[in-house]
């Protein structure tokens, strides 16, 4: 039986020892409380004495309660965590001891001690093994190459491509090609990450001295001596000098009809590429200067805004002046014209019957405290205000002074009330616009 227990222990230990790495998800402090218990005893005189006591055992119980609280929280959120990390395992790690804010003891009144323990909820993180690279990733990671290659083909967007060592390369940098575009030299052939399918032609670099390809009728020996599509075969290469094939296959005619890069090819390629290279250099060193256009547009907008503000101020001032001017019309001191204020005044006078001379008009209400005075209560008379009557320090304030003070205070309260109402209305209007 003992051996079975040991075997089971080893079986459980091995997976845990080889477990994945663990990372913390959340850390929190969990709390338990030790509440004092009432203990009754008697003093020396035999009188009953009550004490509130907390022992070390109570602190241990409070610590266990804090750990149980952490376990309850872990059990509640474990299902949610499993949905977030379905391939992970979860565990709760708590401290061995708790932190208390007091010590065991006794007091005359009820009291408590708080026990706190830190709980760390963790999840397993599997060791990620590097996956094998795909053929596309292998091709894309290869470094650029340079040189002259045959079997070059042109892409849909006009670029030149080769299939070399099982990967596709694109010609970048300075590129020079023959007239037919099947042989090109580039300063940088960069891999595109594309893997050619079986059956697609592959390219090979042309070494120094190679002036031809392996076209029809040509061979390796024909290429070495100038053969090509029409170059000599086995006798037009190394044996061309003795059999006469060299003069017609690899000799004078082989160079002109083969796949070599001639002086004319290089000159033509440079001539074609020069404008684009010049434009690219110019674009990289310069940029369009639109500062003048932007400044002109900004000046025009500023002028329009200034004119609009000036006209609005002028119309407003003229309208206010015409409203308070006794003469108006052609004899007005503020100029003539139908401003927005003038139209508003005409509407107020003609349709609403509001005149600045009338009782309760807007103009008089804002500036004259007597406009609304008839509606304000005036009281039931006035008597002199007397302090310390009959003494040497008697102070007496007459009704005339009291009336003046009352008038001033009522005017102040009226202004404050109007200002409060005005602020409230404008604040509501601003909020409505937003």
From Swiss-Prot:
Residues 252-434, 259-434 are annotated as: CT. Residues 89-107 are annotated as: G1 (Gly-rich linker). Gene3D superfamilies: 3.30.110.160, Phage FD Coat Protein,Membrane penetration domain. Residues 211-257 have a biased composition (Gly residues). Pfam families: G3P_pilus-bind, Phage_Coat_A. GO terms for cellular component: host cell membrane; membrane; viral capsid. Residues 132-200 are annotated as: N2. Disulfide bonds join 63-98, 139-167, 177-184. Coiled coil: none annotated. Residues 20-130 are annotated as: N1. Keywords: Capsid protein, Disulfide bond, Host membrane, Host-virus interaction, Membrane, Signal, Transmembrane, Transmembrane helix, Viral attachment to host adhesion receptor, Viral attachment to host cell, Viral attachment to host cell pilus, Viral attachment to host entry receptor, Viral extrusion, Viral penetration into host cytoplasm, Viral penetration into host cytoplasm via pilus retraction, Viral release from host cell, Virion, Virus entry into host cell. It is found in: Virion; Host membrane. Residues 209-258 are annotated as: Gly-rich linker. GO terms for biological process: adhesion receptor-mediated virion attachment to host cell; entry receptor-mediated virion attachment to host cell; viral extrusion; virion attachment to host cell pilus. Plays essential roles both in the penetration of the viral genome into the bacterial host via pilus retraction and in the extrusion process. During the initial step of infection, G3P mediates adsorption of the phage to its primary receptor, the tip of host F-pilus. Attachment of the phage causes pilus retraction bringing the viral particle into close proximity of the host cell inner membrane. Subsequent interaction with the host entry receptors TolA (low affinity) and penetration of the viral DNA into the host cytoplasm. Belongs to the inovirus G3P protein family. Consists of 3 domains (N1/D1, N2/D2, and CT), a glycine-rich repeats and a C-terminal transmembrane segment. The N2 domain interacts with the F pilus, whereas the N1 domain forms a complex with the C-terminal domain of TolA although with low affinity. The pilus and TolA binding domains are independent of each other in stability and folding. Interacts with G6P; this interaction is required for proper integration of G3P and G6P into the virion. Interacts with G8P. Interacts with the tip of the host pilus. Interacts (via N-terminus) with host TolA. This is Attachment protein G3P. The gene is III.
């Amino acid at each position: 039986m003992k051996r079975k227990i040991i075997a089971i222990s080893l079986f459980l230990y091995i997976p845990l020892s080889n477990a994945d790495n663990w990372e913390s998800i959340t850390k929190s402090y969990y709390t338990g409380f030790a509440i004092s218990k009432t203990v009754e005893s008697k003093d020396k005189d035999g009188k009953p004495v009550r004490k509130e006591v907390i022992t070390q055992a109570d602190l241990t119980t409070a610590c266990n309660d804090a750990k149980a609280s952490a376990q309850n929280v872990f059990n509640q959120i474990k299902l949610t965590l499993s949905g977030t990390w379905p391939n992970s395992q979860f565990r709760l790690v708590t401290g061995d001891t708790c932190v208390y804010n007091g010590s065991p003891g006794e007091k005359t009144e009820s009291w408590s001690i708080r026990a706190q323990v830190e709980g760390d909820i963790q999840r397993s993180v599997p060791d990620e093994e590097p996956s094998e690279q795909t053929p596309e990733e292998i091709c894309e990671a290869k470094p650029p190459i340079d040189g002259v290659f045959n079997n070059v083909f042109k892409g849909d967007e006009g670029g030149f491509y080769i299939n070399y060592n099982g990967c596709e390369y694109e010609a970048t940098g300075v590129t020079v090609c023959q007239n037919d575009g099947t042989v090109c030299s580039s300063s940088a052939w960069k891999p595109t990450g594309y893997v050619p399918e079986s059956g697609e032609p592959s390219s090979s670099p042309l070494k120094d001295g190679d002036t031809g390809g392996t076209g029809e009728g040509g061979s390796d020996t024909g290429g070495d001596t100038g053969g090509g599509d029409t170059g000599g075969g086995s006798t037009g290469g190394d044996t061309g000098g003795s059999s006469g094939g060299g003069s017609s296959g690899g000799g004078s005619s082989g160079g002109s009809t083969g796949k070599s890069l001639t002086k004319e090819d290089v000159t033509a390629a440079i001539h074609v590429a020069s404008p684009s290279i010049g434009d690219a250099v110019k674009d990289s060193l310069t940029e369009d200067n639109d500062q003048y256009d932007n400044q002109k547009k900004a000046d025009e907008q500023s002028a329009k805004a200034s004119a609009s503000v000036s006209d609005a101020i002028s119309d407003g001032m003229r309208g206010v002046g015409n409203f308070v001017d006794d003469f108006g019309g052609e004899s007005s001191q503020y100029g003539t014209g139908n401003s927005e204020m003038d139209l508003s005044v005409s509407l107020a006078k003609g349709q609403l019957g509001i005149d600045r001379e009338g009782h309760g008009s807007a103009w008089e209400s804002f500036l004259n405290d007597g406009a609304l005075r008839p509606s304000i209560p005036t009281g039931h008379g006035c008597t002199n205000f007397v302090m310390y009557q009959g003494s040497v320090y008697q102070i007496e304030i007459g009704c005339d002074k009291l009336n003046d003070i009352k008038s001033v205070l009522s005017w102040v309260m009226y202004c404050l009330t109007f200002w409060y109402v005005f602020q409230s209305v404008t604040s509501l209007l601003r909020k409505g616009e937003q």
